[in-house]
Amino acid sequence: MTKLKNEVTSLESKKTSRRKFFKAAAATGAVAATALAMPNISVAQSAVTLKMQSAWGPADADPFFTMNKQYAQKVEALSGGTLKIEVLPVNAVLKTAEIADGVSTGVVDAGHTVTAYWYGKNPASSLFGTGPSYGFSSQELMGWIEYGGGRALYEETLKATKLDYVGFFAMPMPAQPFGWFKKELKSLADIKGMKYRTVGLATNVLQGIGMTVLQLPGGEIQPAMKTGLIDAAEFNNPSSDRNFGMQDVSKFYSLGSFHQSQEMFEIAFNRKKFESLSKHHQNILRIAAEAANTDNYWYALKRYSDDLNKLVTESGVKAFATPKDILAEQMKSWDKVIADFSAKDALFKKIVDSQKAYAKSVMKYLLLNQPDYSIAFRNTFGDPANVKV
């Protein structure tokens, strides 16, 4: 009898323990469910927001502004909302030429721009975007930065220019058109004495082939051409040009040029602000630039080609290839410009020598290995100049 009583007591004790366990589990589950149902409360309290001055905009009609926002979206997505970037459209706080200094001094936390915009502070800046080709495109130039010693030289250039920020690069831009003219170009003689807009080292290169060059912000190009301040101009791509309304002041669009055959965005962060972030957030800012690098490029190719077709079919623009004698003269002028600057600036020469060494190796492989894709295009569609889309 005593044995049976003890067994009953033991069984009831086990049942009580199980009930306590399930009650505790249910309470824990309720807390977890509540936390899952309200994940944004803690995120919102701990989120860091960086103010980024863009050199582009103010609307999505500007493809570069869209690309800037794509970067910001990737930062927020990768961080789970704990790191955000407020993208400020062009001239919101700083003018385009002021972005580098403004980021360096902390007027804004970050900037989305190109290195050519601080060319006036140091001509070597243009070598990290709008420099000579040596056979490579923007893709290979960015490869040099990350795998050919370019990043250390970029940091050295920032230090020499007294710019205190951390920079990343994104978006390997296609070669820029030679630009908009009052008539179709037939030869080098057609551009002699012409008043032309560009930026960076291209100003020196095109002065060397007989053009008179002015440096103007993007938004001032179309009005300057309309009033006759300049005779011709380039900016960057068919989409930006169409957004500026270049088709309203010119009907002749010269495609293909070595004046700026490669460029990419510089994404700059004030150094103190950057170093105050967690290592996790610092890595996100870097990795987001690498992700935007691909996304921006895919987006650009589709949009640029669509807008070129619209310029031709809807606005009556004649798109034509830049005459070969102009391209040849550009290369000669580049040689002289690079030699002149290298003789005056040891750092400039150091950068050029590094780029040449990288290009000599990498481009030998690519040029020997890559087929001429224009052969395949012509086989399928015909002469690109005559293909209607």
Per-segment meaning from a language model:
Residues M1-S17:
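Secretory targeting signals
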Residues K15-L141, E156-V389:
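N-terminal secretory/targeting leader peptides
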Residues G148-G150:
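Core domains of carbohydrate- and sulfate-ester-processing enzymes
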